[in-house]
């Protein structure tokens, strides 16, 4: 039975959706003021695999990834580049969708944009005001954190520490340093009319509102990068409790960071590996292979040496499938059966909190076992099992498949060897070697 590590309880728990076979998943997506870097892409690759596997288990998964298309960073970038916020956002939404297509991430059912829900956000905030969970200052409307008794539970955030680590540009009218903006009063950048004053919604309110608009609470799974635990997901939890008196999600899943040069990859640090640039050098499946080779709750320290090692592992699987498939073809052997022991182990690994790194190791073991036998039935089962696993991980291996001419070349080569026509045999052998068949 599937077990998932729940960030909220800090332990693995058996996963049971509220309304099987339906599963609802919401993952926080990009703020579209730039292209996505490799760290941004890691959760998207991982949750794509999560959905594929859940569907393999016959669940019906509705998977939403939001797009934050209005935000201070978008406004800052648009002013700097002298373009409209909408045009800037649309440019990077297109870049985001192109990246998803290139990486073959096709499982997202809906990608809501924050600007499509402004009216709903206004109504949401008004409810919080009416219930005493929000208050006005000269700078906007804030959420009153003190009214949430277990605020900080997701990351075990110490509120006394929060007082000490207050932002420099603190609104002096805030009741508590941890109170967060629901509606920002501003004249800079795009603003929206409201019953109170022109402004725009806070990021945490955007997601909380969209979740309630799109799903019946609680979510089965709420996901994102580990950096979103606090304050973003914590503030979503607080707002949902205040607004609807419900819990936001049964399971929280957080994907660890991706480091570069032993530092967290981030735009603010400038140590960015843009996915669009990496894709100019590597097959998209090698990038996915790299991401899935480390458990999602462990950080990845990216390096180009690591990329090269991953590429060699990918090639090893490609070579095996090319040769093994050819061997089965020339022996006129075909079956659709799987190796049940391998598949049982695969499911054990995936149902243990999606241990994709161990599944990668399992694939290497399949190849090792295949090299130790010439039994056609076993080789076919190994190949079928490996291909099914790769398909679940959404890693395509475009291995060479023999044509009729290739098969004829093989049999001519065998005949030349029997006739001791070594010159012709060498010519034919080279043709097969060049295609990776032998």
Curated annotation (Swiss-Prot):
Zn(2+) binds at residues 28, 207, 232, 236. A motif ('KMSKS' region) lies at residues 264-268. It catalyses: tRNA(Cys) + L-cysteine + ATP = L-cysteinyl-tRNA(Cys) + AMP + diphosphate. It is found in: Cytoplasm. The keyword ATP-binding applies. One of its GO terms (cellular component) is cytosol. It is an enzyme of class 6 (ligase). Its EC number is 6.1.1.16. Its cofactor is Zn(2+). Keywords: Aminoacyl-tRNA synthetase, ATP-binding, Cytoplasm, Ligase, Metal-binding, Nucleotide-binding, Protein biosynthesis, Zinc. Pfam families: tRNA-synt_1e. It comes from the Bacteria. PANTHER family: CYSTEINE--TRNA LIGASE, CYTOPLASMIC, CYSTEINYL-TRNA SYNTHETASE. Monomer. This is Cysteine--tRNA ligase. The lineage of its organism: Bacteria, Bacillati, Mycoplasmatota, Mollicutes, Acholeplasmatales.
